Amino acid sequence: CRDDQDGFYTIGAPGQTVTLPPGATDASLTPYHVDRGKLFVHERFGGHNIIDADIIAANIELTRFPVPEDSDYQETGDYPGLVRAADLIGQLADPHHMRKFPALFYEFVETGTSIRLGYKTPGDLRDAYPAFYWNVVNRYIQDGVRHLRVTQEGKQWIANLYSHVFAVEHHEPWNPGSQP
């Protein structure tokens, strides 16, 4: 973002910045990534003849996670809802998702999320994955899944998604260097 300076990063609102502690990674900016993304779009495309920065920002807004309770965030079949579904499916159906649990866990450590969720190890994060999928994610991606079923590549993404959930639910051996 334009207002970023060495050691100071805008958090999405004009004039508001955050400093990262020594050794911090980009994961420390996770709480601000939606607002930073919207700000970047407005900086880059605001006033463009063809690209409507407000529409893009509205799509980005629905990728906010955890999903706010407001009714504006509950729609799943409009473009912003489908963008959120694509974001979630893209992360959770990634062919390498299963071996990313350790890195994701340490991002959670850096942001304090691991403490809030009670995770002490990458295995704790992995063990909680099926409940997270079924109780949190599933309701937000079904319209996206319906669209993915139209193509063979989309069906592969769906298969990846469900195979990851199945593997953890059925306690498949976990080798962080390979897939289940």
Language-model features: where?
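Divalent metal-dependent phosphate-bond-processing catalytic cores, especially two-metal-ion Mg2+/Mn2+ enzymes
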Residues: 3-10, 46-50, 62-180
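Post-HEXXH active-site segment of zinc metalloproteases
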Residues: 4-24
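Short, solvent-exposed segments of well-ordered alpha helices
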Residues: 24-28, 73-76
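Histidine- and acidic-residue-rich, metal-dependent catalytic cores
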Residues: 27-68
